[in-house]
Amino acid sequence: MKGAIVSASLTDVRQPIAHWHSLTVEECHQQLDAHRNGLTAEVAADRLALYGPNELVEQAGRSPLQILWDQFANIMLLMLLAVAVVSGALDLRDGQFPKDAIAILVIVVLNAVLGYLQESRAEKALAALKGMAAPLVRVRRDNRDQEIPVAGLVPGDLILLEAGDQVPADARLVESANLQVKESALTGEAEAVQKLADQQLPTDVVIGDRTNCLFQGTEVLQGRGQALVYATGMNTELGRIATLLQSVESEKTPLQQRLDKLGNVLVSGALILVAIVVGLGVLNGQSWEDLLSVGLSMAVAIVPEGLPAVITVALAIGTQRMVQRESLIRRLPAVETLGSVTTICSDKTGTLTQNKMVVQQIHTLDHDFTVTGEGYVPAGHFLIGGEIIVPNDYRDLMLLLAAGAVCNDAALVASGEHWSIVGDPTEGSLLTVAAKAGIDPEGLQRVLPRQDEIPFTSERKRMSVVVADLGETTLTIREGQPYVLFVKGSAELILERCQHCFGNAQLESLTAATRQQILAAGEAMASAGMRVLGFAYRPSAIADVDEDAETDLTWLGLMGQIDAPRPEVREAVQRCRQAGIRTLMITGDHPLTAQAIARDLGITEVGHPVLTGQQLSAMNGAELDAAVRSVEVYARVAPEHKLRIVESLQRQGEFVAMTGDGVNDAPALKQANIGVAMGITGTDVSKEASDMVLLDDNFATIVAAVEEGRIVYGNIRKFIKYILGSNIGELLTIASAPLLGLGAVPLTPLQILWMNLVTDGIPALALAVEPGDPTIMQRRPHNPQESIFARGLGTYMLRVGVVFSAFTIVLMVIAYQYTQVPLPGLDPKRWQTMVFTTLCLAQMGHAIAVRSDLLTIQTPMRTNPWLWLSVIVTALLQLALVYVSPLQKFFGTHSLSQLDLAICLGFSLLLFVYLEAEKWVRQRRY
């Protein structure tokens, strides 16, 4: 019955369908068993039980305890724990304080806490999605309008919306009055969308073009409407994005994977070497206790205890440097990951472009003008055929500019030297170009006050205003009438309503040939990626306007405007090409516009195809994999398209950075190896899903961040070379002691920890601030799958470790024999302190040599004064361990004579001399 309240049972509700935009309003009511008077409270309660609350559901993640427990799954930490237990048991058995065991346990716990702090940062992207929901909504139930919590909405509810409301669920419009909705967070399109209830759209229309539907999380800017809810909670478009977000699994970064493999190699190698040493010791008749001490020391020596902390500091330093270059790193490992990027997928608007519409071409019947200038700054030149002209000398131009300034609802605002607009960017550009010609838009609007208007709508595709001509300006043609009607909008539609045109400073009849010439000029602008507007006018005897008045118009001309590329982006794209990085444009904009901007920036070339979202949807995985190898520009894409593009690139071994600013971008940002959100225009959801935020929304900043990432990775390789080369030297030195029959372990676990944390750690921190190689962005990206030992690093560590240990073993034998001669005041066990000191001092020379492939004398000290300071400080700390009594007792060292110290210094210099000689030979050879 007409006007009846729906009271259908729960079983009467039909299954949800996918294409609500393709149904009529009546068909939607039938599908949902709903009515304009709303559901009854009973039916709503039944449906709430069936569909659940209108909320986003979060999957359970790892608990903090689970994250902490996972840190102890590291094989190197497990080995250190075993060493601590055995060492502590031996000390307690002998009645000694277990200082070695306690020191090792402290290191293990600190490393675990450090890992926990890096991993425990909860994902907040879903929380940000939830924050987009309004708490209350106006709904019609039991034929009565009422407010209910958003969570209580169900399919079939009739919601009532007006300006300022957030859309609480996905819904099909049933009534609308001048309804405009901001969907940029969901679709990426900046302009408000005109919504109409009485449309029936094709089934394959993308979300951004579903003008008869509303989507959860979007905002009503203007007008009012009534809509029928068809999806709630996780069934909405926002819920689909939440599902995609939670389906993307976080993977370890390349550095984390390399360090895991490094741990496996080091532990395996150490265990094999320990087995060999113990086996040989047994054959030589040595005691198990001595061999156990050797094994414990070797296990501690091979583990680079200070490496996690040094890497964290290096990444933090990189983060600070990136902030200075306008990029904020949200996840520390992303700093190094940037250095592996092989492909950058960038949005167009605001990232590659200025997000400011600029009029660049103007066509009148008699002239074609080119306009220069940047953004909304009212400064630039007008040119004809490349020659600068005076705008005021061309009446056709001035009348056209005046029409654009008057038929306009925007405002041009100056704040110091910064210019911006309030209102629609398209209209703002018309004010700017008028101001470039010397027209004061505000002043012109005062002398031509608006009397009436018909606003722009997506159906009319034009805007009309009637102004009173007070006779105080020459920028109109009164023709004896007190008012003038100005019209702007779709060139084709306005041209159809014109009978005359303004040419040769006078009115002329609009012939078929002239119409064709105007349309051809508009098509040329459109093919260059420009948004084209047509302008016309008609003197009027009355101040009112309706659609019947928009006839018998006089054509003024065309203006072509574009969101101009950022001037620095062309160079950034070129730098990417030199660095072996591919740049792709992925945008929701029109294919012609996207292609024109991409060609201008050097991203693509003439003849290269553009792939649209519709074409992409029709492709299977294999077809898409083939397409992404050659396509650089993607237009009219939806969120799932971005995700598919990223996944396809990753399947082919690409390491992908993806930019985004909307809610719709969040799944792709999370899936990408590096998700890059926009700091100015980005939503909270996109920022929480990202690894990095661009503070200036600028593509060039991504390239600068990639450069910093490469520098950080290069420095990490330097101090890994330094630390592990030294550790291998320590390991081989310790292993040789029982084989040489020296009767004692040359280094205690505590002394080894000192070397690994302090002697290695302080210079390694200084290596982390090494400046980058100027040619670093002229090389191809390093393979993210490469081993930590790749490009000669593994052979370097082995070579240096062997040479280092050879020098130290010779010193150890000499020192052992030399110190057995009794001398007053000197302990015969000081040979162990001499080995300890030689190893520490030799590592200082190693740190100086490892910073560059150039000879040290060719590398200026001023480029990294921190390294020299760290060497001096570490050497002084080592001497304190040797000569300060409390430290002697704690670390088990003995005072050295001047001769002892001179011998240590002499042997420690041998490694530095060897490394410099190796570099000299390499330079001579190549």
Swiss-Prot record:
InterPro entries registered for this protein in UniProt: ATPase_P-typ_cation-transptr_C (IPR006068), ATPase_P-typ_cation-transptr_N (IPR004014), ATPase_P-typ_cyto_dom_N (IPR023299), ATPase_P-typ_P_site (IPR018303), ATPase_P-typ_TM_dom_sf (IPR023298), ATPase_P-typ_transduc_dom_A_sf (IPR008250), Cation_transp_ATPase_P-type (IPR050510), HAD-like_sf (IPR036412)
Active site residues of this protein: 347
Binding site for Ca(2+) 2: 300-301, 305, 756, 760
Protein family: Belongs to the cation transport ATPase (P-type) (TC 3.A.3) family. Type IIA subfamily.
Membrane topology label: Multi-pass membrane protein
Enzyme class: translocase
Subcellular location, principal: membrane
Transmembrane domains' residue ranges: 64-84, 100-120, 260-279, 292-309, 717-736, 748-768, 789-811, 833-852, 865-883, 899-919
Record's function text: This magnesium-dependent enzyme catalyzes the hydrolysis of ATP coupled with the transport of calcium. In vivo, probably exports the calcium from the cytoplasm to the periplasm and the extracellular medium.
Residues the record lists as binding Ca(2+) 1: 727, 730, 759-760
Record-listed Mg(2+) binding positions: 661, 665
Location in or out of the cell: Cell inner membrane
Single GO MF descriptor: metal ion binding
Protein name: Calcium-transporting ATPase
Deletion consequences: Hypersensitive to osmotic stress. Mutant lacks ATP-dependent calcium transport.
Sequence ranges on the Extracellular membrane side: 85-99, 280-291, 737-747, 812-832, 884-898
